[in-house]
Each structure stands twice: as C-alpha cells, then as structure tokens.
C-alpha cells in the first residue's frame, strides 16, 4: 500500500473539518478518532481509501449514546458512528433525480447545497425580507440540542431548521446557500482526510496561531527557498533550522518526495546552538526513525567550528574487539557501549567538519547572520547557492551589505513573496477579507572561489629589482 496516496495505519494525517479547521491525527489500528461536536469514527473504517476523499459520520441506531450506560462511560463520551463516502451519497441522490440534462460540474459541497435547496422557493431580491432576528426560527436551542443528542444526521437537522425558518423563502438563492453553509459548519458530520505534507503542516501551524514558532513563514516563501537552493535528492546540505524541524521537513520532502524507502543518498546536516537540535515537528513527517537517522545528522556550532582532533579522540577511548566487548558483563558492558557511542559521534563530527564541502547552505535562524554566514560559507562548495530566510528585511540587509564586499559571494539579492488568495464563488470573484500579511524575506547568493589576481610585467620587474637591491645590500654588509 502506497503511503503517499493511500490512507494507511501508523501514519499522521491531517483532517479537514466542516468548520474549516484542521486536526492532526495518528491512525493507530483498532482505535477511534474523536472530532468533537462533529462525531467520532473508527480508524479501520477509512483505511485503504485514497487521500482527499470526504467521509460522513452517520448513526443507524446501534451505537450507544452518551445518555446510556452512565456508570461505565463518562457523560461527555462521544458516540462512535459509521463512515461512508459523502460523494457516494450525493451520487446516489443524483441518480434518483437524473432527468438527462447536463449541468456544469460542481464540487461536493456545492452539490449538497444545491440538492438541499432544489425544492425550496427563493426570492429574486431581499426586498420582502424582514430582519426578525431569532424570532424567525421556530425551533428552540433545547430542541436543536435534543436532536444532536439523538445522533440525527446533519441533513435531517438542517432540513428541520430550514422548514422552521419563517422567512427563509424570502432570501435570495445566494443568501440561502450562505445560510446553509453556516449551518453545515455547525452541524455537519463530514471530514476530509489529506496527506500531511510539509505545506499542510505549515498551514496547520499558521491556523493554530503558532506564527512565531515558524518565524512568519509562508508556503510561497518556502517554495522559492527550495528552488533557489537547488535542492536535489543526491545533495548534501548544511542547514540551520529554528522552526522546530519544519524547514528540515521541507528539505526532506523535496529530496525524497515522502518516500520512506528512497535509495537516494542525500543528507541534511543540521547545525544547532543548543545542547540538542529541536526537530520535534519531524514526528509528523511519516519517515521512520531509521530513515531520519540515516539522512539527517545534527552537530552543534561549537563542534562545527572547533571539532576535536584525532589524537584527542584516540587518547580518550580505544574500541575493543567484538569478542572482548561481548565478554564484558554488568556495568562495565553498559559503560563501554556508552563510550563507544561517544566515540562514533566524535568520528562523525570529524567527517562532517573535515575537508568535505557541501552543496548548499539553507538557514532560518535568529542568530546574527553577518558574522555567521561568512564562517559557514567556508564549508560550501564553489558555485553553490546560499539562501537565508528572515522575518525582517533589516537583518538580511545588513547581511547583504556584508557579503557585497566579500569576493567569495556573488550577487547577494533580497527577495520577498506576496500571495493574495481569492475566493471564487459562482458568478463572483474577490480577494479574501482576512488573510495573513507577509511571508518573510529571502537573501540569495552564490558561493564562488575568487581567482588569484594576475601579476603584471611591471610588478614582476619591480619585484626583481627590489630583490637585487636587497642582495647587494647584504654583500656590502658582509
């Protein structure tokens, strides 16, 4: 089963709810997932379906409600329902009402709304609509809550709300659709399962409010960063990531395409300033620990700039033959393998900081870049890109001015991305009323190796005459 296109066990997915919110879920076998007021479902019921499908939670009367068995279950226990494809339900209704006429294709939500309003009268204008407030709705809040506790489907609840609305027929078709969509966001019990890509994870963090955690990143700025850095599957890249592992996830996804069994040998070397690297968000990446350990290596700034020498490592520890190591017992064996892990880590640091040159430098950090980038660039191969992301333009301007005067860097440029999303409704097109402003800035340049300055003939003659004069002066002293 392809985990990139098919829903499978033991993977993280992102669930889109009717309220346009998102929820990250880990699909463990034989467990249930609670979506709050939208219901709960069994994980086994959605396994094997492709990503992007919309499911509906429904109840056929066999489930135990929250009012029953109060002694064995808590009062707020959400009943677990069954799952069916929402598109399949709409398709069945369309087959029953098919009259042979072709209509333009609509989305699943538009189809469901159009079906609900097909048998309801509407007004051409809002001229006869009187704003009565809550008096226009005959159903009380208690009656609606009772229907929800009885586990009625969202369609039944919304139909009763529409029939009980005194002035619903005086609304225009567009106003009726907006009204139904608002009710669906409250009472609908459907959800969409999508693959948890790096872009979806970034959007989830932005919607959640963790903008400072991701340093005001946007999907557009990350896409431009990956293109400017020329990220490839066989490359070895130096990275500084202060977003909790999100930037590393973007790099891994561009290098390996989410394939957990990729044969590519590319690596990401993460430099961190603390005792341990913060790569917490990689737990959502659906990569195995073995894969991450093979392709992601971490090293502190101190070890990168001042690595241990070979003599220091060999003087502190010498590995034993395998037979002698196996013969150790008790605490000596544990102490030996702990020192062996330290020994292997020190050797890895030597390999990463030796004469090896990297294929690019990608940074998203709050450290002082004008002093840090020139030092890290010494480990970057010639004709390779350097891309630095920053929340503010001023920090990157200072970096660009520093690199302008350094012949090792070619054409430092500061870039900014702006994406203005539009909402498209049938017959209408306009920008979103609320949107995230900005997405950070990028500083991009190339690491080059300056050629030695050519020596002119006049300079050569002057040097030779100076040497002859010095030689004559020495003879006179003798």
Curated annotation (Swiss-Prot):
List, alphabetically, the InterPro entries matched. TRM6
* Cellular component, GO, one term: nucleus
Q: Where in the cell is it found?
A: Nucleus
One annotated GO molecular function: RNA binding
Q: What is its main location?
A: nucleus
- Output the superkingdom of the source species: Eukaryota
GO BP terms: namely: tRNA methylation
Which keywords describe this protein according to UniProt? Nucleus, Repressor, RNA-binding, tRNA processing
Task: Please list where the region (Disordered) is annotated.
Answer: 456-478
Would the keyword Repressor turn up in this protein's UniProt record?
yes
Describe, as the record does, how this protein assembles with itself and its partners.
Heterotetramer; composed of two copies of TRM6/GCD10 and two copies of TRM61/GCD14.
Function according to Swiss-Prot or TrEMBL: Substrate-binding subunit of tRNA (adenine-N(1)-)-methyltransferase, which catalyzes the formation of N(1)-methyladenine at position 58 (m1A58) in initiator methionyl-tRNA. Also required for repression of GCN4 mRNA translation by the upstream open reading frames (uORFs) under conditions of amino acid sufficiency.
Protein name according to UniProt: tRNA (adenine(58)-N(1))-methyltransferase non-catalytic subunit TRM6
Source organism per entry reads Saccharomyces cerevisiae (strain ATCC 204508 / S288c) (Baker's yeast)
The taxonomic lineage of its organism, from the top, reads: Eukaryota, Fungi, Dikarya, Ascomycota, Saccharomycotina
